[in-house]
Each structure stands twice: as C-alpha cells, then as structure tokens.
A protein has these predicted regions:
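N-terminal, Lys/Arg-enriched amphipathic/low-complexity engagement segments
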Residues: 1-48
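Short, well-structured beta-strand-loop connectors
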Residues: 50-63, 82
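Conserved hydrophobic positions within beta-strands
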Residues: 78-80
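Acidic low-complexity segments
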Residues: 87-147, 158, 214
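Gly-rich Lys/Arg/Thr-decorated short loops/hinges at beta-loop-alpha junctions or inter-strand turns
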Residues: 164-178, 305
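Histidine-anchored nucleotide/phosphate-binding helix
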Residues: 183-198
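Hydrophobic alpha-helical positions that pack around
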Residues: 203-320, 326-331, 341
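Ferredoxin-type iron-sulfur electron-transfer modules in oxidoreductases and energy-metabolism complexes
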Residues: 359-375, 385, 389-455
C-alpha cells in the first residue's frame, strides 16, 4: 500500500476515537429549533419568513444574502416563534430564526425513499443543472469551513480544475462522523463525487482517507472498482498517513497530487484541485438526486467523561444540550464544551448553542484535560517551527502579534496560518501561540480588506 502524506511539519495527537464503532442514531426532534443566519462563509442569509408563519421540513426560511452566501432551510415543521438574536458557535449574539416544533411534516418535493438514484437514471443532468441544484439547496462545505459549494464548482477564468479531491481524512481527535458516514452511505457518497466531477467538468477524482480508517479504505476501494471501472471517470482511493493536520485543504492537495497551493489569495483550484468534504459529497447526492436541501448532518457527540458517546444524524437547529442529554448528560464537575474537536474546535459558553451546517462534533473535555498549564518563557527550542505545516515561524508570529506590529506580521505571512494548533500543542513552555496568532491574523486580514476597498 502506497501511503502518502504532506511534506512539511505535522504532529500526532492522541486519537481518542471513542465512537469509531458507534452506529449512527437518528437524533430526536427538538422542542424548539434555532437557526443562525450565518452558517456559512460570506454574507448572512436574509429571512423570508415572519413571526407566526407555518413551515414544513425543507421550507426555505432565509435566502442567500449575496453571491458568497447560502439559503437556510427549516429542519422541522411548526410555527416561526420569532426572529431574534442568540449566541451561536462564535460566542457572539447573531440574528437567528426560532421555530416551535409541531409534528414532522415534510415538503412534498423531497424524495424520502431509500431507493439509490444513479446518474444513469437521470440523462437530463447537465453541469449547469447540478451546480444550480447545489446552490438552491444551500449546500456548503461540511468539514467546518462552510464555504458555499457551488462557488468552488465555478472557478474564475484564470483557474482550471483538473480533479476533485474528497476530504475523508477526519484527522481531528475524537471525531468519527465522517467515518460512520462512509461506512453507512458509501454508494451515495460515490454518486455525490460523480456529480461533483460532472459539475466541475473533470473526469479525475480522489478520496483521501487516513490509514486509521482501514474499513472505510477497503469499502470505498471496492465500491469505486465496481462503479467506475470501464467508465470515463478515473477515481482513486488514496491511503494517507496518520498525521495532523492531514485534513487541511492545502496539506491534502500536497499529499494527494504533490502540488503546493501558494499563499492567499491562492486557493486549491489555482493548482487544479477542487477539495470537498465527504459530508459535502453526500449532501450533493441528496440535493441533486433527492431534491433535499441541507438541513441535517452527521455529528459526533463525544468526550472521555460522556456516559454514552455516539454518532447522530441530527436536524440543524437542535440545541447541543439535547444531544448531550441523549448521551447521558453533562458529566459532573467543570467541563469545556467545544463545537468541533480539541485542536480546532471553538469553546462555547452555553449548551443551548444549536447544531449548524458546520458542526461535525460536540466535544466535552473534562476539567483536568481542559485546564491549561501556566505559560513559561520561550526556550527557543523551535519545536513550533518544526510542527508548522505551513512552514511558518509561530514563535515569531505570536510575538509580533502580541506587540501589535501588524506590518511585520503581514510581511511574515501571518495570513497563511491555517490555525491548526500544531504549534501550541507541541510547545513545551505552554505558550499561547495560536491565541496570539489568531488575533493577529484576524487584524491583518481586516487591514488588507480595508486597503483593497480603498483602491
């Protein structure tokens, strides 16, 4: 087996894949669903419903607020309670639509059957129609970045797509939602990949999976041979070394096709690759073949102190508390609640934060694990430099961010940081490297945007 990986940096944190074998359960409907209007990169969605309106499962409740945006659909049936603000996964109050749940009535246009729909059975499908279906269904990147999928399939004239790479790496500790999705919905994922290749007008596809998911590698390799042998598509399952952050977009492109994505504003399609999460491929299948907009997703609920950790198919808008309760409740003592995993997840201030399009995990870290050690002076060991998958100097970026030298930070390429946390994980002095770099990167990007707007 030819095992590939990226060329610079990387670490190997403890996996803690506690729910690896936990078959996906369908989460119970919430009593009240909360839909933030910013569930994607770009402009927030605009409400198209009002207080008192009746909605069904699959009803559009907010339309795209601009070109880089995505519509939002109700995952429940019921009555719009109010349009208000609530704390979302960012920790800030953001506009939301709140719906009181009444029954489970779906829009009639959605195909709820288990029949596998193939591309061959739909000869009328064109690249333009596929992209339009994806756009209208509100499909975004399901790996956490939440970039509208249709935009990736329509690159600028200066870039030419050569392949689609499915990101099935799931290198973040604890999270197993993508693994369970692959084991349970392999056929649908491959049809989703086929649709993505059609939409991008390419015939080459790759599925990158880390070697700690051998059952998924074996299953998808077998399914690919059955589906694509003799077809015009060349699809390969690529086994990848267990190495964090193997699932980073640039690291995945490096590992799979040995091409380096330049610094921002360059994106993978500038070197010929369109990267989509495996959950996105499944959402594309459902959007195009089942006329089902994006309103539910596979999510892991996990933590060493969680009584019954598991994987769930959960309707968006469901409060995290409902999922934690379904797993036995919040453990006693002090805990840290994360939307996502321990490396790149966001710490939350409330268990009422709802599941959104990008929520791949609800992770509960116990007080002992969560407590940071007291930062010590830098010992100049350069471990952070060796760990950085972007070839940056984290100790330097953190220091110049701390003293607010934004011009120097931009010169040192702070905007190339992918915020993976490898530097902070490996630092023996427990320096808050990522904290400072993240703040510095945000400030520098704001300065760059402001400068561009004046031109």
């Amino acid at each position: 087996m030819n095992i590939k990986t990226f060329s610079i940096g990387g670490i190997h944190p403890e996996e803690n894949k506690l729910t690896h074998e936990a078959v996906t359960q369908v989460a119970a409907l919430p009593k009240q669903a909360i839909f933030p209007l910013s569930q994607h990169i770009g402009a927030p969605a605009k409400p198209v419903v009002q207080k008192g309106d009746k909605v069904k499962v699959g009803t559009m409740i907010a339309e795209a607020g601009g070109f880089v945006s995505a519509p939002i659909f109700s995952s429940v049936s019921g009555t719009v309670f109010k349009i208000d603000t609530a704390i979302d996964a960012t920790g800030y109050r953001k506009p939301v639509i709140i719906i009181n749940v009444e029954g489970d009535e779906w829009e009639e246009s959605i195909d709820r059957s288990d029949k596998l729909e193939t591309v061959e059975a739909h000869p009328d499908l064109t690249p333009e129609k596929i992209v339009e279906c994806i756009k209208n269904a509100g499909v975004v990147g399901m790996g956490g970045a939440c970039f509208p999928t249709f935009i990736k399939l329509t690159p600028p004239p200066t870039a030419k797509a050569e392949c689609v790479i499915i990101n099935a790496v799931e290198c973040e500790p604890y999270i197993t939602a993508d693994f369970r999705l692959m084991m349970e919905k392999a056929d649908e994922i491959l049809i989703g990949l086929e649709l993505l290749m059609m939409g991008a007008k390419v015939t080459t596809g790759y599925i990158g999976i880390e070697t700690n998911k051998m059952p998924a590698i074996e299953l998808l390799t077998k399914k690919c041979a059955e589906k694509f042998n003799g077809s015009k598509y060349n699809v390969e399952v690529v086994p990848l070394k267990q190495r964090y952050p193997q699932g980073g977009e640039k690291q995945l492109v490096d590992a799979v096709i040995q091409r380096q994505v330049p610094a921002p504003p360059a994106i993978p399609v500038n070197v010929g690759a369109i990267v989509q999460n495996v959950g996105t491929a499944y959402a594309v299948y459902e959007a195009v073949m089942k006329h089902k907009p994006l309103f539910e997703r596979y999510t892991t609920v996990t933590g060493k102190k969680i009584k019954n950790p598991g994987n769930f198919l959960v309707r968006m808008g469901t409060p995290m508390k409902d999922l934690i309760d379904a797993c036995g409740g919040m453990p006693e003592g002090d805990n840290k609640l994360l939307a996502g995993g321990p490396m790149m997840g966001k710490a939350l201030t409330s268990v009422e934060v709802p599941i959104c399009k990008g929520t791949n995990s609800v992770t509960v870290i116990s007080d002992v694990e969560a407590r940071r050690k007291e930062p010590q002076p830098c010992i100049r060991c350069a471990k952070c430099v060796g760990a950085c998958p972007m070839g940056l100097e984290p100790y330097l970026l953190a220091k110049i961010s701390e003293v607010q030298n934004w011009e120097r930070a931009e010169q040192e390429d702070i905007v190339s940081c992918i915020e993976c946390g490898s530097c902070q994980f490996t630092c023996p002095a427990h320096r808050p490297l990522l904290d400072n770099i993240r703040q510095g990167k945000s400030t520098v990007m704001g300065i760059i945007r402001s400068r561009a707007a004046k031109k």
